[in-house]
C-alpha cells in the first residue's frame, strides 16, 4: 500500500513546482505517485485503487468539496492539502472526521513535509487494521527466535530441501512467518478467547450486529456442529429444515437427538424453495410430533437461510412466530446480509433481539466475503451460557489454528465495516443486476433462442425480489406472500428445454452441455441442474469477469447455431472418447441428452424424490451406531427397497441429503 494521488491542476507555476517536487521526494523513499490534471480522473483512480494511502491537492482551488468526494470512497485516507498563506477557510465540527492534513507551499520545507506525510500514512495503515491482524503483523515484524511449534520455524525447515524450497517460494515469506504457535502470549488464545483473539471476536460482533461472535477456522460445517452440540441435549427433539446441509446430518449422527423435519418446496427446475409459513405454526409442529409419537416439545430449530439457490426467508416472521426458544439460521451462503438495506429482515442477526429467543447464525465468511477457505463465524443474539458453549467450541476447534485464517475473518469484517461495506455490496449488487439485464437484452435481440434468467419480468427496483402468488415467474406452487425473496447476486440462468411448470419441450439444451463449454473457457459454474446454471456474483467478481461470462455464453450460442463439431466445442469431452464423438455435432449431443431426460422424466422424478419424505425407521444417531457395530452391508441401489440406509445419500453440490441415515427406502 504505497500509492499517492496528486492533483496538480493549479494555474500558478510555483504551486505546480511544489507538487512536482513533493512527488519526486515521495518517489525517492519508495512511494508510487500518480499525477493528475483533472479532478474526475483522480476520483476515478481512487475508486479503483484500494492501495492508495494518500491524496494531495490544492485547497485554494478545491477546498472541502473534493475532500467530501474522496471521503465517500475512503473516509480514512489522509488528504494532504496545500494552502496559500493568505487563504482563509472554515470547517464545521461535523466535517472534522475527514482526515485532513494542511501544508503550506514552501519548497524549502519539502523534506519535512514528506516526513509528516510518511507519519500520517503510517498512522492510516495502523488505523485500518483490526486488533488481531495488527498484533499478528507486529509479531511477524519482530523476527523472534522460537523453540516451539510449528516445526518449519517460519519457513526455515522448508528451505533445507529442494521440494521444500519450491513450496516456500510459492507461498512466500509472510505466509511462513505468520504461521506461528499458540504459545505466543501476546496474541492471546482462540480457545480461551483472550487477548487480541477476544478483541477480534468483539470487533466482529460489533460489525455483524451480534451480541457475541466466534471465529471458526475449519468451516461452517464445524460451526453448525458447535451450535448443535450446545443447543441439542441427548434425547432431545429438534426441528430440522429438510434442505439442511450435510453437516447438520453429521450433527444428528453424532448427537442422540430425534429430528422432526420441516419440508420445503421445490420447483420444476430443481431450485430449492423455502419452508411454507404453515410449517412454522404451533399446530403443525404438534401434528408432526404426534405422527412420530414424540411427547416432548422441540428444544431447538435449524433453518437454512438463504437456500443454496439464493432464496431468503422473512426472518423476522420466523423469529417471532416459530414456537421454539432456540433458533439456528444456517447462513453459510449469505455472510453479507448486514451490509446493505436490501437485506433488511433477511438475516438472523438483523433487527432487535426477540424476547425469550436465542438466535444463532453461522456464516461461511470465505464463501462470499473476502477470507481464506475454511474461515467461518458463529454469531449469537440472546442470553446463553458462554462457559458451556465454549466446551462445545473447544470440542470442535483445533488447538493449532492457522492464524492467517483467523486474521482473514477479522479483515473481512474490517472491509465490511460502516459505509465501506455498503459501498462494496452496492457495487456487487449493481454488477449482478446489470448482468441480468444484459442477458434479457441479448435474449430480446435474438431471433430464435438465448439463455433466460430466473427472475421477475421487472427488476428495475434494487431489492430482494419477492416471490408471491400473484406473479408466478418463480414456478413454485402455493407460495406464501411476504415470506421468500430472491437475492439479486445469486443468478440462475435457464437453458431451453423446460418451462416453469415442468413441461419438457421437443428440443432442449441441457445445462450440463453449456457447463462443459464454460469449463473449457475457464469458467466454473457453482451448480448445474438439468436446465439451470447457478452463478454467484461475490465481492470478487468484477466487470471483466462478468463480460467474460457474457462473451462465453454468446460464443456457445454461436457454436450451437452453426452446429459445430463436438471436438471444436468440447475438446476435453471429445478427448475422453474420440471414436464415439468423431463426427458428432453439438446439436446432436444436446438433443440426445435431452431425449434421455424426457424418456426418464428426470425433472419429474427429482421433484417427486424431494416431495415425498422417506419413512424414518430410526434416528441418524442410532443408524450410525449400527454402522460402528458392523451391523450394515453394502448393496446395489436397485436392491435398497425396504432397506434402512445407514448413510446419507446426497448430490453435491448442494450437499442437501435426499436420504437421511436411518430412513427406509420404500420405492
Which stretches of residues belong to each language-model region?
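Short acidic-aromatic active-site loops that bind/stabilize oxyanions
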Residues: 187-197, 213-217, 304
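Short hydrophobic segments within beta-strands
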Residues: 6-8, 82, 150-152, 241, ...
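Short hydrophobic beta-strand segments
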Residues: 2-16, 56, 238-241
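Short, composition-biased local secondary-structure segments
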Residues: 167-175, 214-228, 282-292, 480-481, ...
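A short, charged/proline- and glycine-enriched loop
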Residues: 1-4, 50, 211, 234-235, ...
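Glycine-rich phosphate-binding "P-loop"
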Residues: 185-189, 209-215, 271-279
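Conserved PLP-enzyme active-site core in the AAT-like
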Residues: 23-26, 31, 36-45, 58, ...
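Non-catalytic terminal extensions of PLP-dependent enzymes
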Residues: 13-30, 39-57, 62-80, 84-178, ...
Amino acid at each position: 500500500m504505497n500509492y499517492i494521488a496528486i492533483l496538480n491542476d493549479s494555474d500558478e507555476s510555483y504551486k505546480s513546482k511544489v507538487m512536482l517536487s513533493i512527488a519526486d521526494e515521495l518517489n525517492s523513499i519508495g512511494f508510487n505517485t500518480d499525477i493528475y490534471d483533472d479532478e474526475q480522473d483522480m476520483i476515478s483512480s481512487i475508486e479503483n485503487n484500494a492501495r492508495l494511502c494518500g491524496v494531495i491537492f490544492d485547497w485554494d482551488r478545491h477546498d472541502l468539496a473534493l475532500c467530501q468526494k474522496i471521503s465517500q470512497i475512503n473516509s480514512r485516507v489522509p488528504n494532504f492539502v496545500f494552502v496559500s498563506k493568505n487563504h482563509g477557510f472554515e470547517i464545521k465540527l461535523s466535517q472534522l472526521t475527514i482526515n485532513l492534513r494542511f501544508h503550506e507551499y514552501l519548497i524549502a520545507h519539502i523534506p519535512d513535509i514528506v516526513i509528516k506525510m510518511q507519519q500520517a500514512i503510517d498512522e492510516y495503515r495502523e488505523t485500518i487494521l483490526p486488533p488481531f491482524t495488527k498484533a499478528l503483523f507486529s509479531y511477524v515484524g519482530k523476527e523472534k527466535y522460537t523453540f516451539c511449534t510449528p516445526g518449519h520455524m517460519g519457513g526455515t525447515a522448508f528451505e533445507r530441501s529442494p521440494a521444500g524450497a519450491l513450496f516456500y517460494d510459492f507461498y512466500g515469506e509472510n505466509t511462513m512467518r505468520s504461521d506461528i504457535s499458540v504459545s505466543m502470549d501476546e496474541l492471546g488464545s482462540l480457545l480461551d478467547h483472550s487477548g487480541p483473539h477476544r478483541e477480534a471476536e468483539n470487533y466482529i460482533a460489533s460489525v455483524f450486529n451480534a451480541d457475541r461472535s466466534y471465529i471458526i477456522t475449519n468451516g461452517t460445517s464445524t460451526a453448525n456442529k458447535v451450535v448443535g452440540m450446545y443447543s441439542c441435549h441427548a434425547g432431545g427433539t429438534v426441528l430440522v429444515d429438510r434442505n439442511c446441509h450435510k453437516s447438520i446430518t453429521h450433527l444428528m449422527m453424532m448427537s442422540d437427538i430425534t429430528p422432526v423435519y420441516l419440508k420445503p418446496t421445490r420447483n420444476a427446475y430443481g431450485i430449492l424453495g423455502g419452508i411454507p409459513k404453515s410449517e412454522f405454526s404451533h399446530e403443525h409442529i404438534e401434528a408432526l410430533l404426534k405422527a412420530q409419537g414424540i411427547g416432548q416439545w422441540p428444544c431447538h430449530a435449524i433453518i437454512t437461510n438463504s437456500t443454496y439457490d439464493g432464496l431468503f426467508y422473512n426472518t423476522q416472521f420466523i423469529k417471532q412466530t416459530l414456537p421454539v426458544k432456540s433458533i439456528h439460521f444456517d447462513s453459510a451462503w449469505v455472510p453479507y446480509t448486514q451490509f446493505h438495506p436490501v437485506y433488511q429482515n433477511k438475516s438472523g442477526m438483523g433487527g432487535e433481539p426477540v424476547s425469550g429467543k436465542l438466535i444463532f447464525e453461522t456464516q461461511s465468511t470465505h464463501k462470499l466475503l473476502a477470507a481464506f477457505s475454511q474461515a467461518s463465524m458463529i454469531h449469537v443474539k440472546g442470553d446463553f451460557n458462554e462457559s458451556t458453549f465454549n466446551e462445545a467450541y473447544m470440542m470442535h476447534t483445533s488447538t493449532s489454528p492457522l492464524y492467517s485464517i483467523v486474521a482473514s475473518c477479522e479483515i473481512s469484517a474490517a472491509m465490511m465495516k460502516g459505509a465501506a461495506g455498503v459501498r462494496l455490496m452496492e457495487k456487487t449488487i449493481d454488477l449482478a443486476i446489470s448482468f441480468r439485464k444484459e442477458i434479457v437484452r441479448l435474449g430480446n435481440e435474438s431471433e430464435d433462442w438465448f439463455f433466460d434468467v430466473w427472475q421477475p419480468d421487472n427488476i428495475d427496483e434494487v431489492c430482494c425480489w419477492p416471490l408471491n402468488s400473484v406473479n408466478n415467474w418463480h414456478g413454485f406452487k402455493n407460495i406464501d406472500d411476504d415470506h421468500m425473496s430472491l437475492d439479486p447476486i445469486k443468478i440462475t440462468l435457464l437453458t431451453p428445454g423446460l418451462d416453469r411448470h415442468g413441461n419438457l419441450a421437443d428440443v432442449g439444451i441441457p445445462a450440463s452441455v453449456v457447463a462443459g463449454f464454460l469449463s473449457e473457457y475457464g469458467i466454473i459454474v457453482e451448480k448445474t441442474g438439468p436446465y439451470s446454471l447457478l452463478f454467484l456474483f461475490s465481492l470478487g467478481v468484477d466487470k471483466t469477469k462478468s463480460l467474460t461470462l457474457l462473451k462465453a455464453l454468446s460464443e456457445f450460442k454461436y457454436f450451437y447455431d452453426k452446429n459445430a463439431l463436438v471436438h471444436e466445442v468440447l475438446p476435453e469431452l471429445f478427448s475422453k472418447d474420440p471414436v464415439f464423438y468423431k463426427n458428432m455435432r453439438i446439436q446432436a449431443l444436446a438433443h440426445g441428452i435431452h431425449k434421455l431426460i424426457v424418456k426418464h422424466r428426470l425433472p419429474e422424478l427429482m421433484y417427486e424424490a424431494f416431495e415425498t419424505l422417506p419413512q424414518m425407521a430410526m434416528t441418524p444417531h442410532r443408524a450410525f451406531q449400527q454402522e460402528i457395530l458392523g451391523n450394515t452391508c453394502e448393496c446395489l441401489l436397485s436392491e435398497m427397497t425396504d432397506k434402512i440406509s445407514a448413510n446419507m445419500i446426497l448430490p453435491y453440490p448442494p450437499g442437501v441429503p435426499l436420504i437421511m441415515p436411518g430412513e427406509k427406502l420404500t420405492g
